């Protein structure tokens, strides 16, 4: 029987939510072109679209907001943030950005030229799009076990080091401006990356003179998994684990909207002095002066405080346990999910949930729509809509190995009753899964199409 962790906090403020009737939801879904991104938040009952920017901030963060210094240059909150980032990551330089994709944009603008390739365990959507927008090629080299939804391994987010070495030899280091690891691996089920894999990836890339960056959105959750699953780190403080992870890299991008527990914010941190000068100039053009980076001083303060809160062991035990509870309850109902559960979300395996729908008819998106229709739950497809693409040489559609529906859990927001409701809805839907049909595009933008695409039932 799944056990629910006791929350290490008290609730001081609440926000009302309201369930729409099934007839209303049918109309809402049709008007939105069967894209849950186009649905108003007030029409959603349980919102599991993303854990990005949807956290409940603490009283300490809210108190910090009242201390916002809105000076254009040199606000005190910048230096509080600098102290937090330097202490945790050890990188010499950083710039704040309004969110993670802005940090990616600046990094790739300064490093990637047309024809370059950027390897990773698995790029997430905005990372992939930012590489492509610069004329580069994002390449996923996840270990094979990470593509098997039912295989249980402690670190399924690891990059395949043999694939990485072969890729470098085949492509040439001169055509690889940097390599990356996404920790935890969002596209692959929120799975953690082991310390050994981070270290060995660093050695492989540096052995060829290639810089190494981390996509560190969920670095704290990754550090906690290392503490849980690697006996060599069982007694290590989480801060020291995080510091070691960052020590192997030359820099990182981060959306602070995840493990820094804020509603807006991000940063790009790095060691290279010359690259930092380019980054800072690009930041001024795109985001603003280097001591605010497109953010108000109050947001910088909330981010500084949230970075420390996100490393709290009691909080992370609750956070990971919260997600594990939802996963175990779903497994008790024999609902197919990606195993073992990751840190920030539970991923339904749409190909096993809806085996009668081929990838060309978008089973993940069909399941997303069915979840909303059945229970007012908003989730997101991470499969063919997000990642399928046309082979430029053959014109054939290349589909991803994984066809997932991510139910991302906002931090410190939902209770056990909310998660039980999600389980009950999924169980009802699974019983009548044969009634769910596929979808087809009526509008599909070239980049990041999942945000604005429109669909119709097949």
Q: What would you call each of these model-derived segments?
A:
Residues 291-369, 373-401, 436-447:
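Conserved small-domain helix->loop->beta segment predominantly found in fold-type I
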Residues 386-458:
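PLP-dependent enzyme catalytic core of the Aspartate aminotransferase-like
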Residues 264, 344, 403-407:
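Short amphipathic alpha-helical segments
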Residues 2-34, 38-41, 46-56, 61, ...:
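Conserved PLP-enzyme active-site core in the AAT-like
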Residues 286-288, 375-377, 426-434:
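A common structural junction motif
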Residues 21, 58, 366-371, 427:
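C-terminal, active-site-flanking charged/polar segments
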Residues 276-277, 355-363, 412-421:
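Short, conserved charged micro-motifs
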């Amino acid at each position: 029987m799944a056990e629910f962790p006791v929350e290490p906090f008290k609730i001081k403020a609440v926000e009302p939510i309201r369930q729409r009737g099934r007839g209303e939801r049918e109309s809402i879904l049709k008007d939105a072109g069967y894209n849950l991104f186009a649905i108003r938040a007030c029409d959603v009952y349980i919102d599991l679209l993303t854990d990005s920017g949807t956290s409940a901030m603490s009283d300490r963060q809210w108190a910090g907001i009242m201390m916002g210094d809105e000076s254009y240059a040199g606000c005190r909150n910048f230096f509080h943030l600098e102290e937090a980032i330097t202490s945790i990551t050890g990188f010499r330089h950083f710039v704040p950005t309004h969110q993670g994709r802005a940090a990616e944009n600046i990094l790739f603008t300064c490093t990637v030229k047309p024809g370059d390739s950027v390897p990773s365990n698995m790029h997430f959507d905005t990372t992939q799009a930012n590489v492509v927008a610069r004329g580069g090629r994002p390449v996923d080299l996840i270990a094979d076990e990470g593509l098997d939804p039912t295989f249980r391994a402690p670190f399924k987010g690891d990059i395949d080091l043999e694939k990485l070495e072969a890729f470098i030899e085949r492509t040439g280091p001169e055509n690889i401006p940097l390599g990356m690891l996404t920790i935890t691996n969002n596209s692959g089920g929120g799975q953690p990356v082991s310390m050994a894999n981070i270290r060995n990836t660093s050695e492989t890339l540096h052995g060829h003179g290639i810089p190494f960056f981390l996509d560190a959105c969920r670095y704290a959750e990754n550090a906690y998994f290392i503490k849980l699953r690697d006996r060599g780190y069982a007694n290590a403080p989480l801060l020291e684990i995080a510091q070691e992870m960052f020590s192997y890299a030359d820099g990182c991008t981060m959306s602070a909207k995840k493990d820094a527990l804020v509603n807006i914010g991000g940063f790009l941190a790095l060691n290279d002095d010359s690259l930092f000068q380019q980054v800072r100039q690009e930041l001024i053009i795109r985001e603003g002066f280097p001591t605010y980076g497109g953010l108000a001083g109050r947001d910088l303060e909330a981010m500084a405080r949230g970075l420390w809160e996100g490393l709290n062991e009691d909080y992370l035990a609750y956070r990971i346990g919260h997600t594990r509870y939802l996963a175990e309850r779903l497994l008790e109902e024999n609902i197919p999910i990606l195993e073992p559960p990751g840190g920030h979300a539970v991923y339904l395996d749409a190909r096993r949930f809806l085996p009668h729908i081929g990838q060309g008819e978008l089973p993940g998106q069909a399941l997303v729509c069915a979840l909303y229709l059945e229970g007012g739950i908003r989730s997101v497809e991470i499969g063919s809509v997000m990642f399928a693409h046309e082979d430029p040489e053959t014109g054939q559609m290349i589909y991803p190995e994984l066809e997932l529906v991510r139910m991302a859990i906002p931090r410190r927001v939902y209770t056990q009753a909310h998660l039980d409701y999600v389980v009950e809805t999924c169980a009802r839907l699974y019983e009548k899964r044969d009634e769910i049909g596929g979808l087809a595009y009526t509008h599909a933008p070239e980049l990041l199409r999942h945000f604005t695409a429109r669909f119709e039932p097949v």
